[in-house]
Amino acid sequence: ANHTPLLGSAGLTLKSYPYYDFDHHRLDFDAMLAALKQVPKDDLVLLHASCHNPCGADLSPEQWQQITHLAQERGFVPFIDMAYQGFGLGLAEDAYGLRLMAEVLPELLVAVSFSKNFGLYRERAGGLTLMAANEERARACQSQLLSLARGLYSMPPSHGSALVDIIWHSPDLRRLWQQELTDMRVRIQTLRQALHEGLKAQLPERDFGFIVRERGMFSFLGLTETQVTRLREEFSIYMTGNSRINIAGLSLARIDYVCDALESVIRA
């Protein structure tokens, strides 16, 4: 939801491409690929590295390979948003598509955020990496980025980035961070499994398998706005109007309550 106002305010002309099939709760890769085959040379194509926000449906390694080949063929430039590295399958696994494209393509943009995987949400720590085809293009892009930065914040705060730097350069702290990130990833996966099992028991006629197939914090439950409103007003369960739920906001102790509430509004 943030991409459209952010990129639009930068003066870019925006076009969307198909991605998520809401009816079947899955990535509509054929429709996505068909749309990307129409992208002109040098256009940017925004892609999520992993743990897609808002739907949780990620590209497979084979699909990343197809898009990489298409980028070579069409000449468009991938712009990869990596805000949840480590919450999907692992640090290396979640960066598969990014690393593949960096090896194969001449140009690439990568926006990385440490807000979630370092717990630095209020510090706004992150960075933009630009890979250019040659030194001349790299210098031109750097000049433009410096001009933009000067107009936005001039000198960014260093506290959050300094914390990331300390953790990365300390073997002990880095191991601890990796273990804590693993713990959080396993917690989210456990919550997904518990929610799926609870809903399967309460509503056996509906397929909630997408909950365990998807990755990261978010999934769409496929509810109507009326059902979402009832959950909020009658059960104090909050989610966005399109039924995007934050899996990480659940707890095992409250899964049964959530499943009971969902059964109530769905069967009404």
Please identify what each model-predicted range represents.
Residues 1-12:
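Substrate-binding/gating loop at the entrance of the active-site cleft, primarily
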Residues 34, 136, 197-202, 223-268:
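PLP-dependent enzyme catalytic core of the Aspartate aminotransferase-like
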Residues 97-140:
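Active-site PLP attachment segment
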Residues 10, 73-74, 104:
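Helix C-cap/helix->beta junction micro-motif
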Residues 142-161, 167-196:
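Structural signature of PLP-dependent enzymes
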Residues 14, 78, 108, 238-239:
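Hydrophobic beta-strand scaffold residues
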Residues 21-87:
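Active-site phosphate-binding strand-loop segment of PLP-dependent enzymes
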Residues 176-234:
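Conserved PLP-binding catalytic core of the aspartate aminotransferase-like
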